Amino acid sequence: MISPDAARNVVGIIGNVISFGLFLAPVPTFWRICKRKDVEEFKADPYLATLLNCMLWVFYGIPIVHPNSILVVTINGIGLVVEGTYLFIFFLYSPNKKRLRMLAVLGVELVFMLAVILGVLLGAHTHKKRSMIVGILCVFFGSIMYFSPLTIMGKVIKTKSVEYMPFFLSLVCFLNGVCWTAYALIRFDIYVTIPNSLGAIFGAIQLILYACYYRTTPKKTKAAKDVEMPSVISGPGAAATASGGSVVSVTVER
């Protein structure tokens, strides 16, 4: 019989693969930016938000905050590198006004993280308290990002078209939420359960909408639309799961 820890590790590994795939989902968008040497109408906000979430979860997973959570650090460490690369490309091809705004937001995020780190390490002296404080922050920011698909879902209902909501991406986001919710329930972790259960619910709603409206979607044409599909990314840990948010940009042919 498989032990709970072994089952959780298996689910966590599967979740790692899905999460890593979601981190890489915006690659086509940034390939386009590099080819055109212009960010066009794309915004850096989703990637800045994801960067903050990854920083919070990396801090959550280090031994002095939450022991035995190396996988939390690794998946979100990868997320930091990936999001940092996206932001570097975005900065490289942005006009000065957007660059200054990016630097300002990054500065605020770094100051916020420094305040969190100092406050937690100096003000909380047990792993339980430190995990609780950082975990609550991660749940708060992660849950906010889970509500971002509401805009896309509203557009689907209004237009009776799923052209702005790719099926595969909706499915992967749903599986990601289900996987990490299952991971959290094997050995109950409230900090993981809340945001990932929201992700599973919103992913399920997207799939239901797709089933309802895909027949009424206009046939594809040669024009291309750039779509930003919000999703929240999670990574595993020995005793907890890390979550970060990312808005996945894809190109849908109409």
Swiss-Prot record:
<feature type="domain" description="MtN3/slv 1">
    <location>
        <begin position="10"/>
        <end position="98"/>
    </location>
</feature>
<keyword id="KW-0762">Sugar transport</keyword>
<keyword id="KW-1003">Cell membrane</keyword>
<feature type="transmembrane region" description="Helical; Name=4">
    <location>
        <begin position="102"/>
        <end position="122"/>
    </location>
</feature>
<feature type="topological domain" description="Cytoplasmic">
    <location>
        <begin position="211"/>
        <end position="254"/>
    </location>
</feature>
<keyword id="KW-0812">Transmembrane</keyword>
<keyword id="KW-0472">Membrane</keyword>
<dbReference type="GO" id="GO:0051119">
    <property type="term" value="F:sugar transmembrane transporter activity"/>
</dbReference>
<feature type="domain" description="MtN3/slv 2">
    <location>
        <begin position="133"/>
        <end position="216"/>
    </location>
</feature>
<keyword id="KW-1133">Transmembrane helix</keyword>
<feature type="transmembrane region" description="Helical; Name=1">
    <location>
        <begin position="10"/>
        <end position="30"/>
    </location>
</feature>
<protein>
    <recommendedName>
        <fullName>Bidirectional sugar transporter SWEET6b</fullName>
    </recommendedName>
</protein>
<feature type="transmembrane region" description="Helical; Name=2">
    <location>
        <begin position="46"/>
        <end position="66"/>
    </location>
</feature>
<comment type="similarity">
    <text>Belongs to the SWEET sugar transporter family.</text>
</comment>
<feature type="transmembrane region" description="Helical; Name=6">
    <location>
        <begin position="166"/>
        <end position="186"/>
    </location>
</feature>
<dbReference type="GO" id="GO:0005886">
    <property type="term" value="C:plasma membrane"/>
</dbReference>
<feature type="topological domain" description="Extracellular">
    <location>
        <begin position="1"/>
        <end position="9"/>
    </location>
</feature>
<feature type="transmembrane region" description="Helical; Name=5">
    <location>
        <begin position="132"/>
        <end position="152"/>
    </location>
</feature>
<comment type="subunit">
    <text>Forms homooligomers and/or heterooligomers.</text>
</comment>
<feature type="topological domain" description="Extracellular">
    <location>
        <begin position="67"/>
        <end position="69"/>
    </location>
</feature>
<keyword id="KW-0677">Repeat</keyword>
<feature type="transmembrane region" description="Helical; Name=3">
    <location>
        <begin position="70"/>
        <end position="90"/>
    </location>
</feature>
<feature type="transmembrane region" description="Helical; Name=7">
    <location>
        <begin position="190"/>
        <end position="210"/>
    </location>
</feature>
<feature type="topological domain" description="Cytoplasmic">
    <location>
        <begin position="31"/>
        <end position="45"/>
    </location>
</feature>
<feature type="topological domain" description="Cytoplasmic">
    <location>
        <begin position="91"/>
        <end position="101"/>
    </location>
</feature>
<dbReference type="InterPro" id="IPR047664">
    <property type="entry name" value="SWEET"/>
</dbReference>
<dbReference type="InterPro" id="IPR004316">
    <property type="entry name" value="SWEET_rpt"/>
</dbReference>
<feature type="topological domain" description="Extracellular">
    <location>
        <begin position="123"/>
        <end position="131"/>
    </location>
</feature>
<keyword id="KW-0813">Transport</keyword>
<feature type="topological domain" description="Extracellular">
    <location>
        <begin position="187"/>
        <end position="189"/>
    </location>
</feature>
<comment type="function">
    <text>Mediates both low-affinity uptake and efflux of sugar across the plasma membrane.</text>
</comment>
<dbReference type="Pfam" id="PF03083">
    <property type="entry name" value="MtN3_slv"/>
</dbReference>
<feature type="topological domain" description="Cytoplasmic">
    <location>
        <begin position="153"/>
        <end position="165"/>
    </location>
</feature>
